[in-house]
Amino acid sequence: MPKYRSATTTHGRNMAGARALWRATGMTDSDFGKPIIAVVNSFTQFVPGHVHLRDLGKLVAEQIEASGGVAKEFNTIAVDDGIAMGHGGMLYSLPSRELIADSVEYMVNAHCADAMVCISNCDKITPGMLMASLRLNIPVIFVSGGPMEAGKTKLSDKIIKLDLVDAMIQGADPKVSDDQSNQVERSACPTCGSCSGMFTANSMNCLTEALGLSQPGNGSLLATHADRKQLFLNAGKRIVELTKRYYEQNDESALPRNIASKAAFENAMTLDIAMGGSTNTVLHLLAAAQEAEIDFTMSDIDKLSRKVPQLCKVAPSTQKYHMEDVHRAGGVLGILGELDRAGLLNCNVKNVLGLTLPQTLEQYDITVTQDEAVKKMFRAGPAGIRTTQAFSQDCRWDSLDDDRSAGCIRSLEYAYSKDGGLAVLYGNFAENGCIVKTAGVDDSILKFTGPAKVYESQDDAVEAILGGKVVEGDVVVIRYEGPKGGPGMQEMLYPTSFLKSMGLGKACALITDGRFSGGTSGLSIGHVSPEAASGGTIALIEDGDTIAIDIPNRSIQLQLNEAEIAARREAQEARGDKAWTPKNRQRQVSFALRAYASLATSADKGAVRDKSKLGG
């Protein structure tokens, strides 16, 4: 029988000092012996996805205490990728994932907590907490802050839905008036919550649901809706049950590594491909799998991407549907239900509620459930009122969207495309692979060949795009922006948005060893591995070289013979200490970022730290 970890600090005469300090936090004699559960919050006023979380940690803590546990709350950092976008701040986004994972490990192990409730929401916070959870392998439940309501405004006598990306595109489009740009900016992000499309934050919160580590509805139920409160109350109660199951009944099925098994990871990636999730999810699932000691690689993702269709299309891939519409159509379990009927899921998995996948689908798939409370929950909709308050409204759709032929979520028969929403490409400058969000690529450019325009920083590429130096047919290559080369693997949302602003969204391709925001669409290929700074062939591409992209055949090729590539590699190596570094880039890199770069692996490894350099 496992011993409560917290007993290390609460039992025995030699722990009198620790108990004295615990008493100073409010604990009493009756608390010593109860499970100590960490409430891992991420409240900050910097991030709309987290601005409403201050009181939610207290809500969970109160439920833990009422259920027989002792709750202790702490916060992690949280970077807003949208605010950090387009300047040096973006260098810090991906590295913050490792800091979050480490900080959770530090706090939980230093104080010997028995279990955790992780209150996350945005881009690197959910992945960081997920990595920590699988590293620590103690009982955990995730409950996120929830999606933002979609922005809405009237343009050309028509009400349209908006998000952050629309504001960026309109702001950079010289054809758009100042008044219209201002109108869109003020309408794009109306409430607290993670940005309203299938961007990285919402993608990851959907994937924690598919992994079994969060409750039904977690990925899609709006931040503002009163129904979401129940997820937090349930999490506080359920984590105590999970904790006692493990420590008092020796039930290892309560542990996250047994819930988020390899089968669960495959199901999560299948969901991601079917819903056209953010390409960043590939990085994060690879990283989380390594923490769980699961053999889950780019090869597994490639195999899944070749057989899973696209069953859901959401902003930024379409303006018609946002997360509020996904929820109305049944949320994550609506998509999983269709994937199950298509025979594409492994049903031998359980979730934090203790339900198998078939049991969960029977209760929560809106096309089959008989539970009226579940149907009511999935009718939770937006209020259209600007607010930063959680649970502030109780509006509901008049009906569910259960139309699987023409609705937001489709059945296999009526799939948006037979190919899924993500694809892995390989070629002679992406030997270890690269990623494209096919859900956002127009059919007319699934095959694309053009001359390279090479830039060694995102800033230079943006200047060239806005300056008219990139023209129809070009393949924009942005390199030395990988995990090591950036360092920090910046998102390229501004270059892709500005290509659209200049009317080139369907006329150019963009390739990078950096990454893309979940808000990116278009022929945008990222995560090229190995990256330039690690000796990747992308560092050898020159202006005018022809690059051929063939998404249907999963191919990306630099059309040069091997002898020329070898000659360029030899010339690069001859640069000595300057080899595999940008020639003319001026960038101030802090010590903290240099430390990150010294251990960073390429994207095909999840951009995690290279354990071999630490002797592990």
Swiss-Prot record:
<comment type="subunit">
    <text>Homodimer.</text>
</comment>
<keyword id="KW-0411">Iron-sulfur</keyword>
<feature type="modified residue" description="N6-carboxylysine">
    <location>
        <position position="124"/>
    </location>
</feature>
<keyword id="KW-0460">Magnesium</keyword>
<dbReference type="InterPro" id="IPR037237">
    <property type="entry name" value="IlvD/EDD_N"/>
</dbReference>
<dbReference type="GO" id="GO:0051537">
    <property type="term" value="F:2 iron, 2 sulfur cluster binding"/>
</dbReference>
<dbReference type="InterPro" id="IPR000581">
    <property type="entry name" value="ILV_EDD_N"/>
</dbReference>
<keyword id="KW-0456">Lyase</keyword>
<feature type="binding site">
    <location>
        <position position="122"/>
    </location>
    <ligand>
        <name>[2Fe-2S] cluster</name>
    </ligand>
</feature>
<feature type="binding site">
    <location>
        <position position="81"/>
    </location>
    <ligand>
        <name>Mg(2+)</name>
    </ligand>
</feature>
<comment type="pathway">
    <text>Amino-acid biosynthesis; L-isoleucine biosynthesis; L-isoleucine from 2-oxobutanoate: step 3/4.</text>
</comment>
<dbReference type="InterPro" id="IPR042096">
    <property type="entry name" value="Dihydro-acid_dehy_C"/>
</dbReference>
<feature type="binding site">
    <location>
        <position position="123"/>
    </location>
    <ligand>
        <name>Mg(2+)</name>
    </ligand>
</feature>
<dbReference type="GO" id="GO:0009097">
    <property type="term" value="P:isoleucine biosynthetic process"/>
</dbReference>
<feature type="binding site" description="via carbamate group">
    <location>
        <position position="124"/>
    </location>
    <ligand>
        <name>Mg(2+)</name>
    </ligand>
</feature>
<keyword id="KW-0408">Iron</keyword>
<dbReference type="InterPro" id="IPR020558">
    <property type="entry name" value="DiOHA_6PGluconate_deHydtase_CS"/>
</dbReference>
<dbReference type="GO" id="GO:0009099">
    <property type="term" value="P:L-valine biosynthetic process"/>
</dbReference>
<comment type="pathway">
    <text>Amino-acid biosynthesis; L-valine biosynthesis; L-valine from pyruvate: step 3/4.</text>
</comment>
<comment type="similarity">
    <text>Belongs to the IlvD/Edd family.</text>
</comment>
<keyword id="KW-0479">Metal-binding</keyword>
<keyword id="KW-0028">Amino-acid biosynthesis</keyword>
<feature type="active site" description="Proton acceptor">
    <location>
        <position position="517"/>
    </location>
</feature>
<keyword id="KW-0100">Branched-chain amino acid biosynthesis</keyword>
<protein>
    <recommendedName>
        <fullName>Dihydroxy-acid dehydratase</fullName>
        <ecNumber>4.2.1.9</ecNumber>
    </recommendedName>
</protein>
<dbReference type="GO" id="GO:0005829">
    <property type="term" value="C:cytosol"/>
</dbReference>
<dbReference type="GO" id="GO:0004160">
    <property type="term" value="F:dihydroxy-acid dehydratase activity"/>
</dbReference>
<dbReference type="GO" id="GO:0000287">
    <property type="term" value="F:magnesium ion binding"/>
</dbReference>
<keyword id="KW-0001">2Fe-2S</keyword>
<feature type="binding site">
    <location>
        <position position="491"/>
    </location>
    <ligand>
        <name>Mg(2+)</name>
    </ligand>
</feature>
<feature type="binding site">
    <location>
        <position position="195"/>
    </location>
    <ligand>
        <name>[2Fe-2S] cluster</name>
    </ligand>
</feature>
<comment type="function">
    <text>Functions in the biosynthesis of branched-chain amino acids. Catalyzes the dehydration of (2R,3R)-2,3-dihydroxy-3-methylpentanoate (2,3-dihydroxy-3-methylvalerate) into 2-oxo-3-methylpentanoate (2-oxo-3-methylvalerate) and of (2R)-2,3-dihydroxy-3-methylbutanoate (2,3-dihydroxyisovalerate) into 2-oxo-3-methylbutanoate (2-oxoisovalerate), the penultimate precursor to L-isoleucine and L-valine, respectively.</text>
</comment>
<dbReference type="InterPro" id="IPR004404">
    <property type="entry name" value="DihydroxyA_deHydtase"/>
</dbReference>
<dbReference type="InterPro" id="IPR056740">
    <property type="entry name" value="ILV_EDD_C"/>
</dbReference>
<dbReference type="Pfam" id="PF00920">
    <property type="entry name" value="ILVD_EDD_N"/>
</dbReference>
<dbReference type="Pfam" id="PF24877">
    <property type="entry name" value="ILV_EDD_C"/>
</dbReference>
